[in-house]
Amino acid sequence: MSVTSIMDDLKRRMHGAISAFKHELGGLRTGRASASLLEPLTVEAYGSVVHINQVANISVPEPRMLSVSVWDKTMVGAVERAIRDSGLGLNPITDGMNLRIPLPELNEERRKELVKIAHQYAEQARVATRHVRRDGMDNLKKLEKEGEIGQDEAHGLSEKVQKLTDETIADIDKILAVKESEIMHV
């Protein structure tokens, strides 16, 4: 394995940790409606379990309203049940093949709970980033031991890996701060 491929792999995997973190945060409900709120929900359709966005179109017609247009009339009840049983505290209103989902105001207690969950997601992303750093450091030590790179080069590269790790964790913290203010903003 070459130094370039090790560094490229580290960048790719650290970027992946940030992407996964952003995706998890997208599922957290803030005061604003977002189609990503319903994306993780599954429904039984045609003998298998699929995500809601595979049987319906999710849109945001108003800031505090979600609209779900189910493509198959027989699926309306299952989609409504999945939303109601999701634990998100949502109550869909059925209108033919469309479901309108008003988002209730978040109370202070629920906001604090959501911030705690966001912090847990951030910590998972930081841990994933540190695991990537450890793998990179191990690979550099292996290259040094095999004589492919010198001690000075290995030291310089390990500093680059640490810098990349610090930047990634700083990005995670920035994203968390934005999400936290979004959740707590009334």
Curated annotation (Swiss-Prot):
UniProt keyword annotations, A-Z: Cytoplasm, Protein biosynthesis
> In the UniProt record, does the keyword Membrane occur?
no
Can you supply a Gene Ontology BP term from the record?
A: cytoplasmic translational termination
The record's subcellular location field reads: Cytoplasm
Source organism superkingdom: Bacteria
Q: Which CDD domains match?
A: RRF
Q: Read off the Pfam families from this record.
A: RRF (PF01765)
Known InterPro entries for this protein? Ribosome_recyc_fac, Ribosome_recyc_fac_dom, RRF_sf
Q: Which SUPFAM superfamilies does the protein's record reference?
A: Ribosome recycling factor, RRF (SSF55194)
Gene Ontology cellular component? cytosol
Molecular function as annotated in GO:
ribosomal large subunit binding
As for family, the record states: Belongs to the RRF family.
Q: What does this protein do?
A: Responsible for the release of ribosomes from messenger RNA at the termination of protein biosynthesis. May increase the efficiency of translation by recycling ribosomes from one round of translation to another.
Indicate what this protein is called per its UniProt record.
Ribosome-recycling factor
